[in-house]
């Protein structure tokens, strides 16, 4: 009999975000991948919301589109074949919730991966566009070189955020020796960020 992981990273992220998703109007899936996060967002939001999902691989968006259609939710998600770095070309409103699932598309080319330079460029901009009480969730995978670089930068950068404007939390299974994912949750606590 297989043991159920009650505190797996995916379950923790969904638990932490569920309340925020229900109240969100503009949501962004920065790293769409196979579409699981976009599906979760679409399943847990009302019809009158705006979900934007980004990926640089057509294969990822095709998988996402198939998954969303299978659940009759494709109409709720705007899929963009573009980097999340260019989010401002598509989303001008304040954003209520942003989710990152860094790394590479499972089952695809592991050399096509998110890059620290993109994160460095986009995250400060995204935080400026985050609505009051908006939330950013970043799942960081440190089992590959690009993931280690992203995580090193995240650890350094997130500690510099003004604690009067942002709450930053971190979750990890620290008794696992297999490069378990690390989850960062950022909540804007004031109306205007002071980055």
Label each residue range with its predicted role.
Residues 99-121:
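Mobile active-site "lid"/loop adjacent to the S-adenosyl-L-methionine
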Residues 50-55:
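Conserved SAM-binding motif I beta-strand of class I
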Residues 31-35:
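Class I SAM-dependent methyltransferase "Motif I" SAM/SAH-binding loop
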């Amino acid at each position: 009999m297989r043991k159920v992981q009650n505190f797996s990273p995916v379950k923790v992220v969904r638990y932490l975000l569920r309340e925020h998703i229900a109240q969100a109007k503009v949501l962004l899936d920065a790293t769409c991948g196979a579409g699981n996060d976009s599906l979760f967002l679409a399943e847990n939001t009302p019809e009158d919301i705006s979900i934007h999902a980004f990926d640089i691989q057509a294969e990822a968006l095709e998988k996402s589109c198939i998954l969303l259609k299978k659940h009759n939710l494709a109409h709720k998600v705007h899929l963009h074949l573009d980097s999340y770095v260019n989010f401002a070309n598509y989303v001008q409103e304040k954003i209520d919730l942003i989710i990152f699932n860094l790394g590479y598309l499972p089952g695809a080319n592991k050399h096509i991966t998110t890059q620290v330079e993109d994160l460095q460029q986009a995250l400060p901009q995204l935080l400026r566009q985050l609505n009051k009480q908006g939330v950013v969730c970043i799942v960081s995978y440190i089992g590959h070189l690009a993931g280690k670089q992203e995580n090193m930068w995240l650890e350094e950068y997130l500690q510099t955020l003004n604690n009067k404007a942002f709450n930053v939390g971190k979750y990890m299974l620290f008794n696992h020796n297999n490069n378990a994912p690390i989850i960062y949750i950022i909540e804007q606590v004031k109306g205007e960020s002071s980055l």
